[in-house]
Amino acid sequence: MATINQLVRQPRAKQVVKSNVPALEACPQKRGVCTRVYTTTPKKPNSALRKVCRVRLTNGFEVTSYIGGEGHNLQEHSVVLIRGGRVKDLPGVRYHTVRGALDCAGVNDRKKGRSKYGVKRPKS
């Protein structure tokens, strides 16, 4: 236990909280341009072809972002909106593209959980 004098001379160090999404720079979302759109395979024990894209953000960061939902219209030079949120079985993927914003279209024929995939309410 430190004495009062020791604490006066050198206060206790504040704990530094490290961000899980440093490229967002404390913003909720960031805009960026796709530099590469491709598929990659997840870690064991999962098996799939996950759709991801490399995005150059407006602040100069280049990040890998997951494209959720079935099917997408993204290609190189598409402008996308990026939010935080990692994909547990894809190492290095710490961001998601926002569906239904900018050049990224919503998911076709999506009926449930529409808000997460940029789909308007269907005409009853």
From Swiss-Prot:
Keyword match tRNA-binding: yes
Function comment: With S4 and S5 plays an important role in translational accuracy.
Name under which the protein is recorded: Small ribosomal subunit protein uS12
3-methylthioaspartic acid modifications at: D89
Subunit structure: Part of the 30S ribosomal subunit. Contacts proteins S8 and S17. May interact with IF1 in the 30S initiation complex.
HAMAP family xref list: Ribosomal_uS12_B (MF_00403_B)
CDD domains hit by this protein: Ribosomal_S12
Keywords: Methylation, Ribonucleoprotein, Ribosomal protein, RNA-binding, rRNA-binding, tRNA-binding
GO BP annotations listed: translation
One Pfam family from the record: Ribosom_S12_S23
Record-level Gene Ontology MF annotations: rRNA binding; structural constituent of ribosome; tRNA binding
GO cellular-component term (any): small ribosomal subunit
Family: Belongs to the universal ribosomal protein uS12 family.
